[in-house]
Amino acid sequence: MQTALLKPKIIAVEPLGDHHAKVVMEPFERGYGHTLGNALRRVLLSSMVGYAPTEVTIAGVVHEYSTIDGVQEDVVNLLLNLKGVVFKLHNRDEVTVSLRKDGEGVVTAADIELPHDVEIINPGHVIAHLSAGGKLDMQIKVEQGRGYVPGNVRKFGDEASKVIGRIVLDASFSPVRRVSYAVESARVEQRTDLDKLVMNIETDGVISPEEAIRQSARILVDQLSVFAALEGTESAAEAASSRAPQIDPILLRPVDDLELTVRSANCLKAENIYYIGDLIQRTENELLKTPNLGRKSLNEIKEVLASRGLTLGMKLENWPPAGLEK
């Protein structure tokens, strides 16, 4: 009996217009069309990297509920129009661009001043309409991101966004505008119980539908590879061991390694201080109460410990460690 699962042998891409395509994949075992189609759709909508305006500064505007003399749109509508501009950045994660225009006419995305490594996919997109004597002067910050990030999330986490006049925008970074899928019947030789996956993908032009589905598949493979390799699994004993505080090896060495005078060493052993870890937990007052250990011996101990980066009165957790012999 054949136990190997079928893999799709046919992957066809049918363009349906600008940045819009239908991708057909077949054959799949029954049920795999919905399993993979739903997973790919969710990744396409949530996890694709894109670019969006995130902050705007407009000359003469303090907040988004203002109006601008000579501009037909109020600031709220102006910002909504600005969100429709599709930016694409090359070799950088963020950029600040300028838009300056005066005089009667239409302001479009093509009026934005761009560096050489930034492009606008829809330069004809209308941003505003200026009346006679109108003037628009804007600074627009564009960033790379993933998914949807509300402006209030970034506003409270970024000190720079608290500057008066700087308007923080809700940012929709996803370059994928619409995704739908359907599962149809497929046939291979005598088998008629197979699935055909048909995906309808529309992007904003930053990436093509074909590249979008490639990237989403890579993300799924990368996420599932953890389960395939069983990475990150460990026994309870290993987990407990990894969480246990690590003890500096020098603390496990006997006090004899400090090469103290015989008098000082004998005084310490008389107080059951056998290891350097035992010694550093004692305070000066505690050691001065030790019979036959005076101020001179105490100073000697402090100097020797200091040469090793240690002091008296230190706190150690889980001391003594298990298995340490006295």
Curated annotation (Swiss-Prot):
GO terms for biological process: DNA-templated transcription. It comes from the Bacteria. Residues 247-326 are annotated as: Alpha C-terminal domain (alpha-CTD). SUPFAM superfamilies: C-terminal domain of RNA polymerase alpha subunit, Insert subdomain of RNA polymerase alpha subunit, RBP11-like subunits of RNA polymerase. It catalyses: RNA(n) + a ribonucleoside 5'-triphosphate = RNA(n+1) + diphosphate. InterPro entries: DNA-dir_RNA_pol_insert, DNA-dir_RNA_pol_RpoA/D/Rpb3, DNA-dir_RpoA, RBP11-like, RNAP_asu_C, RNApol_insert_sf. SMART domains: RPOLD (SM00662). GO terms for cellular component: cytoplasm; DNA-directed RNA polymerase complex. Keywords: DNA-directed RNA polymerase, Nucleotidyltransferase, Transcription, Transferase. Residues 1-231 are annotated as: Alpha N-terminal domain (alpha-NTD). Its EC number is 2.7.7.6. NCBIfam families: PRK05182.1-2, PRK05182.2-5, rpoA. DNA-dependent RNA polymerase catalyzes the transcription of DNA into RNA using the four ribonucleoside triphosphates as substrates. Belongs to the RNA polymerase alpha chain family. This is DNA-directed RNA polymerase subunit alpha.
